[in-house]
């Protein structure tokens, strides 16, 4: 007897598959953390891929202790700046913003993204924030950070990207002190996460435009005599006679790509300061020369070259412990074929 088991093609987990509202990914959850306060996210721009030769340090691996070739993604990570501190409170309707403290040292380029406050007292803002913390109305503290793409040569833009980053660890009083120390200053990736640790990488994927159901959902092409009707890359039917409408689960053509996706537990192999050491001959394809600090991540990450990539400490930590990998060779061979 024939096997009638036939699962549906494609996943409904991300429906509706429509374009992302912004190229800046958003996080709605943060890893639990103890100890001193720390920022829990960073952002950079995707440069390209290469490969390295490193020692396999995974315990019980068949190649443990031997040299292996690993594909890596390079992300350029110029320092980010902290523009403001935002306090949240919780009520019966959920979480909402309570107050904000803006720095007086804002980049003029940030004015192309948002309307900058003209007259603002940072000291008065922190005084009001401390009073709110003492009253017990503050539940979370977040930092508003922005990138500095004007320092890059591979990304043709000057307007910064503004994003919200949670401040984790410590008590609320310690978080306020930490916020006072970072507001208006530059922050590096090494202040968030270190080499050998695992991170979640989020980006807006490469846009494919409007695609048919075969490529978009992975349905089968019509076989044999069914393909003679002139519709080989279409679904067999749109559904039953009743109900008198097409169900949303039916695979149809539409937008493919340009959606937010997260890769969990990506290992950070190296955080470097001088990008010229790993720039291949002729530069990275569609990017050019790498001159700023960079991070080397094992495997691939979502999005095309020059796309904004957000990095967050892993929220689903695996069994592997953080160890600084022993990288013996980084390929700088030309990627132009």
UniProtKB/Swiss-Prot annotation:
Pfam families: Ribosomal_L3. GO terms for molecular function: rRNA binding; structural constituent of ribosome. One of its GO terms (biological process) is translation. PANTHER family: 60S RIBOSOMAL PROTEIN L3-RELATED, LARGE RIBOSOMAL SUBUNIT PROTEIN UL3. Belongs to the universal ribosomal protein uL3 family. Part of the 50S ribosomal subunit. Forms a cluster with proteins L14 and L24e. This is Large ribosomal subunit protein uL3. It comes from Methanosphaerula palustris (strain ATCC BAA-1556 / DSM 19958 / E1-9c).
